[in-house]
Regions:
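Periplasmic-binding protein-like
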Residues: 49-56, 113-116, 147, 169-179, ...
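Flexible loop/turn connectors
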Residues: 160-263
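Short glycine/serine/threonine/alanine-rich loop segments
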Residues: 23-24, 72, 110, 140, ...
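Glycine-rich phosphate/diphosphate-binding loops that line cofactor/substrate pockets in enzymes
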Residues: 103-112
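Hinge/beta->alpha junction and helix N-cap segments in small-molecule ligand-binding domains
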Residues: 1-10, 28-37, 89-99, 115-162, ...
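Alpha-helical recognition/docking segments in bacterial nutrient-uptake
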Residues: 1-99, 165-166
Length: 263
């Protein structure tokens, strides 16, 4: 089961490759808020499903529990819950945010600000941990970082950042953004207000979406190997299907900085 999120296309390519390699047939289902999960799970089992890849980016613990009781092997992708015994393949969000923030500091020699998502999910909170860790490691005070809470979409972040600028709130010399969409929207608002990027304000994003190369200037960001992430998730699911072991694992996919022109 997957939800429709921005990196779904590349992730699904990896899942498809992994399934073909393991000789599994892939069926993609979309689940919506009002769907009866128990009924869907029963139907999948009736149709002979061997396992479930669950893209849980925006899911909470109570959303996951029906899958842990369904009797089928499950691998959770892009989320993790310490209280649930469940295999997962996730992004090393803390590492990525740390690398991005550390790079910002070394490029600008300035206290970084944070374009933080106003919509809270596990991944963004892990990125917040990485952001503040980099600040502490560079001998800076976390309390001095300017934080703006912006909608995690291009249009939403653009409108929110316009409001921040109009209010006269303090702006930072450089910003780490929770994702590329927030970065793109904020950059547009800053540019329209007369700020030059990166000469006046530097910005770095997270996810390395295709749009990054089309933004002016091209957006520096954190690359997540989404296709590889999908392949690894299938490999782990196949191991569970073919094993009697009850041990669960958490696999974190490492990230890397992509240096472009925004910082």
């Amino acid at each position: 089961m997957v939800q429709d999120v921005p990196f779904f296309s590349q992730l699904s390519e990896g899942i498809d490759l992994g399934c073909r390699h393991c000789h599994y047939y892939l069926n993609i289902s979309y689940i919506y808020e009002n769907d009866d999960i128990e009924t869907l799970l029963s139907e999948w089992k009736r149709l002979g499903a061997k396992g479930i890849l669950l893209l849980g980016t925006e899911m909470e613990k109570h959303d996951i529990k029906p899958f842990t009781r369904c009797g089928l092997p499950v691998v959770l992708i892009d989320n993790y819950f310490e209280a649930l015994n469940l295999d997962c393949v996730t992004i090393n969000n803390l590492q990525g945010a740390y690398l991005a923030t550390d790079y910002l500091i070394k490029q600008t020699h300035a206290q970084p600000g944070y374009l933080h998502s106003s919509y809270i999910i596990t991944g963004f909170e892990e990125r917040a941990d990485g952001f503040y860790k980099a600040i502490r490691k560079n001998g800076m005070s976390t309390s001095r970082s300017v934080v703006h809470h912006l909608s995690p979409t291009v249009d939403g972040a653009y409108c929110d950042m316009k409001a921040v600028i109009k209010s006269g709130d303090e702006l930072a010399r450089c910003y780490f953004a929770d994702n590329d969409l927030i970065a793109a929207g904020a950059m547009r608002a800053l540019s329209e207000a007369g700020y030059r990027i990166p000469e006046d304000i530097s910005v770095i994003g997270f996810d390395d979406m295709p749009m990054c190369t089309y933004i002016t200037p091209p957006l520096s960001t954190v690359h997540v190997p989404k296709q590889y992430m999908g392949e690894i998730a299938v490999k782990r699911l196949a191991e569970i299907i073919n094993s009697t072991s009850a041990s669960h694992v958490k696999i974190e996919i490492s990230t890397e900085i992509i240096k472009r022109k925004s910082c």
